[in-house]
């Protein structure tokens, strides 16, 4: 265990320097320095509060743990680490895993079987992830397993079960549900027209309100231009709930790159 990762009481500048390598992933590139400092502060708290448990021979290096903590911290960067206090352990498989499950058919008969899962959030229990998909969550592609499962935990704070409505003001619930269901119906209509593979968003979002909230939270943080363009009302709801505006952050970063392009590689010849 490398101790610096867990020392949340260090000066911010020193702490940020130590986290520099962990922060160096595309998903976090748009964050400015104050945002990085807030993110690292929350991630440090989460590393102190949670146990990351590798399974099936997976070896978790300090860098891997730091990056995982940063991914968990991103959705609660402005809310605070306390918003993820509904679990204490994160179980991590090397790759998607097989689980036994029971399901009920239309006649009410219960069947048993197995399915391959990328992740799970257990009510009043741990989060289960796999490192293969965690690595695929480092970019700005619209896919983010960690944010998906964290969103389920945030959803569960509102009554102990996930229904697509996290803790928000009662006066906002009706319009939140209306806009979320509109998004679900719209995604399902697209699936009906072009099929699952041709849909512009993950078809899993059309499953139920809880999955819609979790999937659209992935887009909110890792493909905000797609979510805002497709469902602007949902995007605004999420801005208010998460207290962040990832699209504005992305545009700010892109503008800074345009104003200050990186130097071209030069080659000297003898």
Swiss-Prot record:
Residues that bind Zn(2+): 111, 148, 152, 211
Gene3D superfamilies noted in UniProt: Collagenase (Catalytic Domain) (3.40.390.10), Glucose-regulated metallo-peptidase M90, N-terminal domain (1.10.472.150)
GO terms for MF: aminopeptidase activity; metallopeptidase activity; zinc ion binding
EC number(s) per entry: 3.4.11.-
GO biological process annotation, one example: proteolysis
UniProt keyword Protease, yes or no: yes
Subcellular location: Cytoplasm
A Pfam family annotated for this UniProt entry: Peptidase_M90
Family in the record: Belongs to the MtfA family.
Its job: Involved in the modulation of the activity of the glucose-phosphotransferase system (glucose-PTS). Interacts with the transcriptional repressor Mlc, preventing its interaction with DNA and leading to the modulation of expression of genes regulated by Mlc, including ptsG, which encodes the PTS system glucose-specific EIICB component.
Protein name as annotated: Mlc titration factor A
